[in-house]
Every structure is written in C-alpha cells, then in structure tokens.
C-alpha cells in the first residue's frame, strides 16, 4: 500500500484545465450479454427440467443484485421448494407458500437441510460459502448438482460458466422456461412436524433464552425490524418467523462482534417508520456501546434487548479460554449515564419471565416513543442447541492442520 499526503490547501487551488462546473456522478448501467444470457438460460432450463425434485436457495447477494423480486417470481413460476441461506433471511418473504426455512447445513430449520441436500438439483442465487455459512465446510452439497447464480455470472453443474449475465435478467428469463415441479415441497410438507414450544416457566424462575425469544416473536409485525448481533442471537433470531413487511438484518460474512449497535443506529435512522428490535449480547455491546449516545441524540425509539450471560458465548463454543469471560458492567446504569436527562430513554433489568412480560408491555405501551433498553439476565450456559452444534463443527474446521498444498 502507498499513502499520498496532500496539503489541505492544495485541493482547492484552481487551474485553467479544470472544469469549473461539478461533473455529475453517474454509473453506466450494466447490461447482460444477450447471447450469453440466452445460452445460460437454455442450459439451466435443460438441467432443471430433467430433475425430479429441484429446490431454490436464496443467498445474501440477492440484495446487491436487486434480484429478490425476480427470485420470488422464479419460485412462483416453478413451484420449487424455496429456502434461504442464513444471511439472506428477510430477503425472501417467509409467508411464501413454498418457503421451507433457512438452509444452514447441520443447523438448518427443521426438515429444510434434508430436503435441500437430498435434491437432485439446486439453484443457489447469490450464495456466499465461507466457514460460518457452511458450518465449518460441512454442507452435504455436490457441485455437479448445483446451478450457482452470482450477480453477473452463472455456473451450471460445475461445468459451463456464463459471464456478463445479470442475475435479475437470468432469473426472470429462466422463470419462463421451467416446467412446474413441486415434488420437493410436497416431500417437505409430507414429513414436516411443527416446532415445539419452550417448557412453561415456574413463578419467578430465572429467565431462559428460549422463553425470551417466544415473547420477542409476539412483538413482530410489518412495523418492526429485527437486528441480530453476532453470537447466539444469530441462531435465536434465525428461528423467528418474520411477518410480511418485517425487516431483518444479519451479518455473518466477517463475524464482526459489536456490529449490530451501529447497524441498529443506521437502520432506525434510515427507516424511522419501523421500530427496531435489536438482540445484542453483553460482550458485543461492550465493543460499541457509545453508539447509543447518537441513537438518543437522533430521538430513535429502538428496543434493545441486552442479553447478559457474562461473556462471549459463541467464542466459548469455538475456542474457549479465560479471555471469553468479561468484566460485568452495570449496563442500565451506563445507558442512564449516556442519557443524562436529554431525550427519551427508559431502562430496566429483568430476571424472570414475569418481569420480561411487564417490560415488553411498557416498552410497547407507555414508552413506545422512547429508546427502551432492557437488560436480560440469563445463565452463562443458556445457549441454543444450534450454537452448540455449529460451534463444534467450526472449531473442528478451524483447528485442522494446514493443507501442505
């Protein structure tokens, strides 16, 4: 890398060769190569129409390709079972009649991985396969069964690759060429068993995380959005059923701890008509807590659930050590200090289900126009079963010996 230092007085110095008027910023629109597009659609249609039980899986690059609507059109036209990768949750409507949940290998929504991995053809639209999304590279997928559609490139069955083909154009054209085939969804529907519910809490019993998320589920509507912090909230928020119009943000490309505090600030500022519900662990919050100050200055009405379990729980499952136990803070006291009597802010600390119900009622009632900070005290070992499975697999992948090649 090279750094060029320029004196602060130099950029404004005029010169006769410079245009006096500002040059308008514009990006030339990208266009598909028509011959490549037609060839890619022809090859994909031939491949998928021969399959017995094909499926569709949406990935996070649907957003950058602006192809979510085209992907849903393809699902409507084809009748294929429809799943999403974890970081694409919220980009595909979960009320779609053929939606089968999140495909995340061993920690997928119940019955979803079995349907996807047993399919004889799968189309992935905008996937990212890294150690986290592949659960330590343990996905049971075969490249020769897959069509990989990237924002400007299509690869058919690990063979022919077609460049300069935009995802949006490809999916729309492919929808017109596929035969209707709902075998995979029918198989899913046949074996599906609804989720169970958490055990009922005894009076004043210490709050369990699965009980807390049962109550968060009831808060969701088209007027809310969920921000899931890196950590166990990844897995608990994945299991939330998003109503139509409910926003959702989830970052796992880098596993960035603390990202959700700033993301909550930005989302609430960009979409003021929605009430943001952020689920943040105590370890993550310590990294970026100061962003709450700007939330208050901007008059945001976010609900933050600070899940205090005394450490970096996700890191414990990947690689445990004394560094994963953190100094406990008085989190509500910290937010009260940041509030400092300016703006609308309400904080509380809850230890049991009764207190949680009361806090949610207050946050969605009398304090609905305030930033609400609810610190939830839970046991340090209270994790989702998905984190236990995922952590074991990622830990094994991370600790494997280096490849000599």
Swiss-Prot record:
Binds 1 metal ion per subunit. It comes from Pisum sativum. InterPro entries: DHS-like_NAD/FAD-binding_dom, PDC/IPDC-like, THDP-binding, Thiamin_PyroP_enz_cen_dom, TPP_enzyme_TPP-bd, TPP_PDC_IPDC. Its EC number is 4.1.1.1. Its cofactor is a metal cation; thiamine diphosphate. GO terms for molecular function: magnesium ion binding; pyruvate decarboxylase activity; thiamine pyrophosphate binding. SUPFAM superfamilies: DHS-like NAD/FAD-binding domain, Thiamin diphosphate-binding fold (THDP-binding). It catalyses: a 2-oxocarboxylate + H(+) = an aldehyde + CO2. The keyword Zinc does not apply. This is Pyruvate decarboxylase 2. GO terms for cellular component: cytosol.
